[in-house]
């Protein structure tokens, strides 16, 4: 400190220049040694291009997408059509069918309900194990066709079980009486099994129901008719008569006796008829 006070002004200036030149050399040397020819030590370099990125004081506001969660309300489409003046436009009407036999297929449902009118879609419901749950759903484009199907097929026996029909989303409490007689042929299992739906009023008049004569049927019935090909001899015809005897009304005189064997027809239960049907299909597959 005392030496600096004794120095002249020129010596002090010269000494300061020497100190500054020496500091620059040190910093450049350090920079070349560390960075391999860089300009010198500096802030940490970021990114693949070694660009000195400085944080900006400004922020960019990105637009946030907000999804509106509106409560679901049924019937908005129909209300919109009515508000637009299209009150005459009819939308699809869902028909729920329950108490179905497990042997009923989608093809049976289509052929049965398409006799009423155009069917928009149809499906049999299955459980988690892949077995039919005994329910189905049919959608008609026209509401009038759905009500007509309800009046004709409600409580009608299909494979020995009465179908229960209900229109979803509508008032179907008023049930109209069944028509006098309606025959609908339903073909299943690739054309080898035919079901005929015969509808009569409960306690109604006389009529033949698949080979029976003059019965007062307790409920509309569905009988099965088997084709006669792939079989020879009188055994097939006798079996055919046995299936016809299934459709007799109470108190009716059966005319479905076997024509081939000449024996008196034997009354069979629904389980026996199903077994005969399965054996017939097995024989038909073996012969084919």
Swiss-Prot record:
All residue ranges annotated as the RRM domain in the record: 93-170
An annotated GO cellular component: nucleoplasm
Region annotation Disordered: where it falls in the sequence: 1-55, 201-288
Main location: nucleus
GO molecular function: mRNA binding
Annotated InterPro entries: ALYREF_mRNA_export, FoP_C, Nucleotide-bd_a/b_plait_sf, RBD_domain_sf, RRM_dom
Residue positions where N-acetylserine is found in the record: 2
Sorted UniProt keywords: Acetylation, mRNA transport, Nucleus, Plant defense, RNA-binding, Transport
Start-end of Basic and acidic residues biased regions: 264-281
Biased composition (Gly residues): 232-260
Location of the protein in the cell: Nucleus, Nucleoplasm; Nucleus, Nucleolus
Domain of life: Eukaryota
Signal peptide feature range: none
GO biological process, one term: mRNA transport
Family: Belongs to the ALYREF family.
The protein's role, per its UniProt record: Export adapter involved in nuclear export of spliced and unspliced mRNA. Plays a role in disease resistance. Mediates multiple defense responses triggered by NEP1, including stomatal closure, hypersensitive cell death (HCD) and defense-related gene expression.
Subunit annotation: Interacts with PARP1. Interacts with EIF4A3.
Entry protein name: THO complex subunit 4D
Taxonomic source organism: Arabidopsis thaliana
Taxonomic placement: Eukaryota, Viridiplantae, Streptophyta, Embryophyta, Tracheophyta
């Amino acid at each position: 400190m005392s030496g600096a006070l004794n120095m002249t002004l020129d010596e002090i200036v010269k000494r300061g220049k020497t100190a500054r030149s020496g500091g620059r050399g040190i910093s450049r040397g350090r920079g070349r040694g560390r960075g391999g020819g860089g300009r010198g030590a500096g802030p940490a370099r970021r990114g693949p291009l070694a660009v000195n990125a400085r944080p900006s004081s400004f922020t960019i506001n990105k637009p946030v997408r907000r999804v509106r969660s509106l409560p679901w309300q049924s019937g908005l489409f129909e209300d919109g059509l009515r508000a637009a003046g299209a009150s005459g436009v009819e939308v699809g009407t869902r028909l729920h069918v329950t108490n179905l036999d497990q042997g009923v297929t989608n093809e049976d449902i289509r052929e049965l309900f398409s006799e009423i009118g155009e069917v928009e879609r149809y499906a049999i419901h299955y459980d988690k194990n892949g077995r039919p749950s005994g329910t189905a759903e049919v959608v008609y484009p026209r509401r009038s066709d759905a009500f007509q199907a309800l009046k004709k097929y409600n409580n009608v026996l299909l494979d020995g079980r009465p179908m229960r029909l209900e229109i979803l989303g509508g008032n179907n409490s008023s049930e109209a009486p069944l028509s006098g007689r309606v025959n609908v042929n339903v073909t299943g299992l690739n054309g080898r099994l035919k079901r005929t739906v015969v509808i009569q009023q409960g306690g109604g008049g006389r009529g033949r129901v698949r080979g029976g004569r003059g019965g007062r049927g307790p409920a509309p019935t569905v009988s099965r008719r088997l084709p006669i090909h792939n079989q020879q001899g009188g055994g097939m015809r006798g079996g055919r008569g046995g299936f016809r005897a299934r459709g007799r009304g109470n108190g009716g005189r059966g005319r479905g006796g076997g024509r081939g064997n000449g024996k008196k027809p034997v009354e069979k239960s629904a389980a026996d008829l199903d077994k005969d049907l399965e054996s017939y299909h097995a024989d038909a597959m073996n012969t084919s």
